[in-house]
Structure formats: structure tokens, C-alpha cells
Amino acid sequence: ANLSGASAILLIAAAITKEESLRFTKLANQLKMDVLLELHDESETDYITPLNSVIGINNRNLGSFVTDLQKSFHMAKLLPQDAVWVSESGISDANIVRELRDVGYKGFLIGEYFMKSGNPEGNLKRFIQQIVAP
């Protein structure tokens, strides 16, 4: 990834071991790359180390592909306060983004909602306006 010009890598806890996660995180840090550690449930929180400064919670169940936004709210109680939290998948409402921000999330991965629309650019602009509106 680094040789291709990437500035960050995604480590999906469900796809690698804890040892691999730690090894890849250390290597990325040596290469001055950011790491997004993606978790899917409570059982994966033991992948978190002090080296993980960005942690994503994927609301999509990898087995059924069903999304449950409550996962991000539940997992917020288990995440280190000094990390940047990213809520991933299933977000289609600006009010949800506000609620997630209120519990500590700083980033949001929203793709399907915009890509399924006929006007992704226009919908993104409206979505952002709704988020920042008082």
C-alpha cells in the first residue's frame, strides 16, 4: 500500500489475527501510515492497542449483511476515549450522524446511501447541510 502511495491501511479484525493486526499496525506506523482498525462486535475489542488511534465500527453483519446502527452506540462504551471513532455502514440519516457525534464519533463511512441515489453529489451536499444545520 505504501509503495502505491497510500497514506493509510484498513485492518479488518474479522479477517486477521490479533498478532497480525499488531504486526501490520507497527509496520504501518514505521512507514508513517495511518491505520483504521475495523471492528464488528464486542469480541474484537481485544484487538485494540495503544497504537490504534483510529477505530472503525462496522454496523454491517459480515454473515447476513444486515446493518444495525445500534452496534455503533453500544460499542462506543467500549472504545478508548483518546482514539478517533468512525461509524461505518448503514448510515442514511443526518440525525443519526448527529447522535453518533454526541456519543463521540468523529468520522462516518457512508457509501451505499449516496451511490444508490440518482444524484450522489447533490445528496451529499444536502446531507452535509442537514448535519450542520442547527
Label each PLM-derived region with a short phrase.
Residues 37, 57, 87:
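Active-site flanking residues adjacent to catalytic metal/cofactor-binding acidic residues
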Residues 2-9, 29-33, 50-60, 80-82, ...:
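Glycine-enriched alpha-helix->loop->beta-strand junction motifs that scaffold or abut catalytic
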Residues 2-4, 41-51, 87-110, 122:
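Catalytic cores of alpha/beta
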Residues 16-23, 40-50, 54, 62-82, ...:
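Short loop-to-alpha-helix "cap/lid" segments that border enzyme active sites
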Residues 78, 101, 116-134:
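C-terminal helical cap(s) of enzyme catalytic domains, especially alpha/beta-barrels
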Residues 4-40, 47:
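Metal-dependent enolase-superfamily TIM-barrel catalytic cores that perform enediolate-based chemistry
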Residues 3-20, 57-66, 105-124:
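Glycine-rich phosphate-binding active-site loops on the catalytic face of alpha/beta enzymes
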